[in-house]
Amino acid sequence: ISSRVEGCAIKWPNDIVIDGRKVCGILTEMSTQIDYINHVTIGVGINVNLTEFPEEIRETATSLRLECGHVVKRAPLIAAVMKRFEQNYTVFLEHGDLSGLKERYSELLVNKDREVRILGAKEQYNAYALGINQTGELIVRKEDGTFPFSGGTGRSTDCLLYTSDA
């Protein structure tokens, strides 16, 4: 999407936004053992040709059709998404982590160099988002140092919010 739409960015960890409005969400589920991945399930939802949204998300959501100004054909879009996924997955397998992708990810990271509000299961704090590390954790800087934040438990209480428009 970022190669075709100006203003496209990643909102860590799993949203694609265009000028701050969500156009795509990605959900993952993984089953692992100590040193083995049993399976990974990935779900991608893209707002393709919607022209209206429910009132509660109208200000925060968009679609490719609204951003591009024309109807977007789904088949070529899905083919392009799958091709890019395959390319990125190949890089991931070569490195065994996200180190081969983190520079591009950080370039597209809308959270980078912004003050964010971390709402964790055990603590809440403001920090500055610096980028991601090789495991995909968001690197944040607080007064007492620099730390990775994973949002790790998958609970809805673990999240990150913007606090300023840097």
Identify the function of each model-found stretch.
Residues 108-118:
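Short coil-to-beta transition motif at edge beta-strands of beta-rich domains
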